[in-house]
Regions:
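Short acidic/glycine-rich loops and adjacent helix/strand connectors
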Residues: 1-339
């Protein structure tokens, strides 16, 4: 009887680190490092997850046939340098770790840092072959555990290796990308930047989504100038307002944005009507952009089933709009939309 093929998925040097072990395609264990080190959305190498996997389960590193990570690091580095070299000298700020929220901050050399971390963990032990999976491909693969035999898949997050929004067709055991949209034209990135502008921390986007319900449509029309909808499901962030592709989170918005929507709120400051109204505008325009993409997918792909993945899939209000305002008959969002 042949030994089962063991594939170990690893998330490290980015947010929500952890492990997942598959044996002959079936999930055996899944560990989120934050459950052990008690640090929400931890970026630390999953040492405790490895300890539990290899010390308390019937596994060793020698049993692992392939190690996978949810990034194509060459494509990621190429995309990052394309942005940096295209917007110099201001974009040199993107090389500073503080310019990034969800990553370790040094995404350019992600693969090298991962190898160093693995060597520190396992010393001279032979490491299994590494398979790098495109970031949005990894998100889209959630289709395979969905309840659908066929579906359209929409992925939206901060950014992947080459894009921040993408669409796929899934049939049986096949998955094919059909559409994608730029690296820094990102609803996820915009929402994170606005979350910071409103005085909250990264990963508190859900708080801003809730705050939006308390706001008035004061800024909605003006915020539509920030996210410009275009043909074929595309949109772009207006660089007159958004400077995240030059400064990251160090200075994500331009002076024009500040003149239009007000200065940043400091953490702990009083929440005023203008903060609630800005959150409301952000949420409304985010929903409009999501629906713009979904309607393009609906027009160009035959399935009446939709799977949504990536960080923007956590925006439950936008998801409800998809069910209510599009022709998709069934929408499935994974309980865990992380990497």
């Amino acid at each position: 009887m042949a030994r089962p093929v063991n594939i170990l998925g690893l998330v490290s040097k980015t947010h929500d680190t952890g492990l997942a072990l598959l044996c002959d395609g079936q999930p055996k264990v899944i560990f989120e490092e934050e459950r052990f080190n008690r640090e929400k959305h931890t970026k630390k190498f999953p040492h405790r997850s490895f300890e539990i996997l290899f010390n308390h389960a019937e596994n060793s590193l020698a049993d692992i046939d392939y190690l996978t990570i949810p990034w194509d690091t060459k494509l990621l580095a190429a995309s990052f340098f394309r942005v940096v070299t295209g917007n110099m000298p201001a974009s040199l700020h993107l090389l500073r770790p503080a310019a990034h929220a969800t990553q370790d901050g040094r995404i350019v050399n992600l693969w090298m840092r991962l190898q160093i971390a693995m060597r520190r963990r396992f010393r001279s032990m032979k490491l299994p072959p590494l398979v790098q999976v495109g970031h949005h491909d990894a998100h889209a693969a959630i289709f395979f555990v969905s309840p659908f035999e066929d579906a359209s898949v929409m992925v939206m997050d901060g950014h992947g290796d080459v894009c921040a929004s993408s669409a796929y067709e899934g049939h049986g055991n096949q998955l094919r990308q059909t559409w994608q949209l730029g690296f820094f034209d990102s609803l996820g990135m915009l929402y994170t930047c606005a979350t910071q502008h409103l005085g909250f921390k990264p990963f508190e986007e859900g708080t801003v989504m809730a705050l939006a319900a308390c706001g008035e449509p004061t800024y909605v029309d003006r915020f539509r100038d920030v996210v410009i909808l275009e043909d074929d499901g595309r949109f772009r962030l207006n660089r007159d307002y958004v400077s995240v592709d030059r400064y990251g989170l160090l200075r994500p918005f331009t002076q024009k944005f500040l003149d239009t929507f007000g200065p940043p709120r400091l953490p702990g400051d009083e929440l005023k009507d203008r903060h609630r109204d800005l959150a409301h505008a952000l949420q409304v325009v985010t929903e409009e952009a999501v629906l713009h993409i979904v309607r393009h997918i609906e027009r160009t792909q035959p399935s009446k089933n939709l799977v949504i993945s990536g960080g923007v899939a956590l925006n439950c209000v936008a998801n409800a709009r998809i069910l209510r305002d599009t022709g998709f008959e069934r929408v499935w969002v994974p309980p865990c939309a992380s990497d």
